[in-house]
Amino acid sequence: EEYLSRVNRILTAAEQHHVQVIWMGIPYMKQAKLNKQMRYLDKLLADEISPKALWIPTDKLLSNGSDTYADSVNINGKIIRYRSKDGIHFSAEGQKLLADKIMEKIVFQTTPEMNGEERTEQLSAR
């Protein structure tokens, strides 16, 4: 409950400042006990955040679509490691995948300037 209260404070502050929030879910974890805890937390967060912000689930994204932890995926016959050996953190390739998923959701809009030039200024989430 305290954790969700903190999450809501962040979302409220963002709303007050007219800032859109993109929140990424929690991926599967290698260690079973930690994974069980994180699945519970991920569900709580998704239920709380989805109506108020853009929620990007990461569990299946980082596990090649399966319902279990995977540190690597096979892409066109090439093994790509997305997770570090600790089963928690991300490799550089995993970080890039997550960044790409965030960028897919951002819409860059141009606004006209007084001198006729356009400037990219506003961001909005899809």
Q: Model segments located where?
A:
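Compositionally biased, proline/threonine/alanine/serine-rich low-complexity intrinsically disordered stretches
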Residues: 110-126
